[in-house]
A protein has these predicted regions:
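Feature of Fe-S/electron-transfer and energy-metabolism proteins
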Residues: 1-621
Length: 621
């Protein structure tokens, strides 16, 4: 550990980089961990003192996030993705191979402190798995040959900056393009269209320019652009499907000193990776949509500011995204007087997540932005009136902002010409699992599941998980259902399982995921997900009985009715669906008894009997 004077100097430097702002605590902790490897007790104590926070507050925040470490970890931290699609591609065997090769047990640190190996939730590389993270950097397409190469680099203590670029090459795998992915919008076009919409010239000067310089009431540009968003019937692409136009209107009308625009790029739902591709290929479009939103909210009269909350697994995108922002500032598309419009000031900063699935929920994300544990807030009030720092805040998904930018340029009628009446436009699907061509597929809303399966080369499919573990698991009899808010809504995940897969193993992976990702705030979710995990593990171990199935049904009802947020409400979906559609996968594992103990008492006491030398009937007393 660094000596105290050097530690204090390091803390001062990092805190200064963040303006001494305690709301940036998560970012400060990430930066300090980057320097020191882990967050040792002296560091936590000194940082708390420097920020004027309690030690318990700082340690509590650090303990909440999976990618912040309060105990020593290896100089090289290798995390294998534990998502079901990675398991289907052999991730468990590959983890065991690397552990044996380097003599490091899963979940442990090597004796010399060089290496630690463990698992993590989905890394967003489902179309090119198995995936893993090394010190936060994503590496796709893992096989034994690649692991041999990684092992050698680690043993040679090669700095990761010197590792071969080929290891980190991530493909976009865009298989089908439609309106969004095939757009030819140039940077600034959507903003300029919004600025001029609804304005009428007087001489050589537009009304908007006269209004700013002569005190004339503002031109209808913001209101007219908002009307186009509303006319398009664009709905949030994060899964909930709330009207984007109504959300922006409510935020615009809410009183506040500053209105905030937040892009939720924390796509932690297992099986989802569309936002990774959008941020890689179409970052300008994302930032364009955020800027249009800021124009609607502020109209150049109210102060606005933007955040992009980037999931920690996408750390490799941080530098390219910051470069894109810098270019847009140079081109007058961010900063002061955007596109030459006096008073239209807006900028965007990127906050990096630290490994918490629950931060995909908008109020939990805002808590994280404020430097807190990512625990969802009670609602109402909603973020549109009381969001970041208590100010009006719009939180939308990456794909939503992209669509909004296109609407600002082309208009609402153009957009709603695609899709269905209740689900306008197109949807990006992250297709993975048992298919020949995994990747990104863009379709107009209303496409059937069967059409997607045909296009991706799926054969002998028995099930599709739509929208990840929190979504809906359907069987072959439902493949004519449609991807749409009125039928099968989705945040984007589309996981394919053929007839060789045991659906019990699939749902068990999902149950373990929810038990790990519960924020722990409310008892129904914290205890309920743990109990669900215990029951399904009991069935997996061959000790399940009909009583356990009934227990699952009771847990589902309690969690759905009493959990604090959406995670607890949807954590039961996998078990609900597998019992409805694939019940034999559970029934064949059950014993004929109505009840079976959760563990073998005699087996558990075997060691005690051996130590005491007793083998009589009362040996357990």
């Amino acid at each position: 550990m660094t000596h105290l004077p050097d530690l204090n100097r390091s803390i001062d430097e990092v805190v200064a980089l963040h303006g001494g702002d305690a709301t940036r605590l998560v970012q400060i902790l990430l930066d300090l961990q980057e320097r020191h490897g882990w967050l040792a007790p002296p560091l936590v104590t000194a940082l708390a003192r420097r920020l004027g926070l309690s030690r318990a507050r700082v340690e509590g925040v650090a303990a909440f996030y999976s990618f912040l470490y309060l105990e020593p970890v290896g100089q090289y931290r290798v995390l294998f993705s534990d998502n079901i699609t990675d398991r289907m591609q052999g991730s468990e065997a590959l983890l065991a191979y690397l552990s044996e090769k380097l003599w490091v047990e899963k979940g442990k640190v090597s004796e010399d402190g060089l290496l630690s190996i463990d698992t993590t939730s989905c890394t967003g590389l489902c179309d090119q798995g198995p995936g893993l993270l090394v010190n936060g950097w994503a590496i796709p397409r893992i096989d034994r040959e690649r692991l041999d190469q990684i092992a050698q680099l680690i043993l040679e203590r090669q700095p990761m900056a010197q590792w071969p670029d080929e290891l980190f090459r991530i493909e976009d795998n865009i298989r089908r393009q439609d309106t969004l992915l095939a757009h030819n919008l140039r940077p600034g076009q959507a903003i300029r269209a919004a600025l001029t919409r609804g304005e009428s010239p007087e001489g050589d000067r537009p009304v908007s320019e006269r209004s700013w310089r002569e005190g004339i009431p503002a031109a209808p540009g913001p209101a007219a652009t908002l009307e186009e968003i509303k006319r398009s019937n664009l709905r949030g692409r994060g899964g909930a499907g709330f009207s984007t136009g109504l959300k922006w209107e409510a935020c615009r009308d809410a009183p506040g000193d500053t209105h905030y625009v937040v892009c939720n790029a924390d796509e932690g739902e297992p099986g989802t990776f569309k936002d990774r591709v959008l941020l890689t290929r179409h970052a300008d479009l994302v930032f364009e949509g955020m800027t249009v939103c800021a124009y609607i909210l502020g109209g150049g009269r109210t102060k606005t500011h933007g955040f992009l909350y980037l999931r920690g697994e996408y750390r490799h995108l941080l530098d390219p995204l910051n470069e894109c922002l810098a270019r847009r500032r140079r081109d007058g598309l961010l900063g002061k007087d955007i596109c030459g419009r006096p008073g239209f000031d807006f900028d965007i900063e990127i906050h990096l997540g630290a490994g918490a699935y629950v931060c995909g929920e908008e109020s939990a994300l805002i808590e994280s932005l404020e430097g807190k544990r990512g625990i969802p807030r009670n609602r109402p009030p909603y973020p549109v009136t009381h969001g970041y720092l208590g100010q009006p805040t719009v939180v939308n998904n990456v794909e939503t902002f992209c669509a909004a930018a296109l609407i600002a340029k082309e208009g609402g009628d153009w957009y709603r010409a695609q899709g269905t009446a209740k689900s306008t436009g197109t949807k990006l699907l992250s297709v993975s699992g048992d298919c020949e061509r995994p990747g990104i597929y863009e379709y107009p809303f209303g496409v059937t599941v069967r059409q997607v399966l045909d296009d991706c080369g799926a054969r002998r499919t028995q099930a599709v998980q739509v929208s990840g573990p929190s979504g809906t698991l359907i069987d072959a009899s439902e493949f004519d259902r449609r991807i749409a808010f009125e039928d099968l809504p989705t945040a984007g995940a589309f996981m394919v399982f053929d007839e060789t897969r045991d659906m019990f193993d699939v749902v068990r992976n999902f149950v373990h995921f929810f038990a790990h990702e519960s924020c722990g705030f409310c008892t129904p979710c914290r205890v309920g997900t743990a109990m669900m995990k215990g029951v399904i593990d009991k069935i997996h171990a061959g000790r399940g009985a009909q009583h356990d199935v009934e227990e699952i049904c009771r847990l589902q009802k309690v969690m759905y009715l009493a959990a604090h947020c959406g995670l607890g409400h949807t954590a039961c979906n996998p078990m609900r669906d597998v019992m409805q559609r694939f019940r034999p996968a559970i029934q064949r594992r059950l014993k004929s008894l109505d009840f079976e103990p959760a563990f073998d008492l005699d087996g558990a006491l075997a060691v005690a009997r051996q130590m005491t030398g007793r083998d009589d009937a009362k040996a357990h007393l």
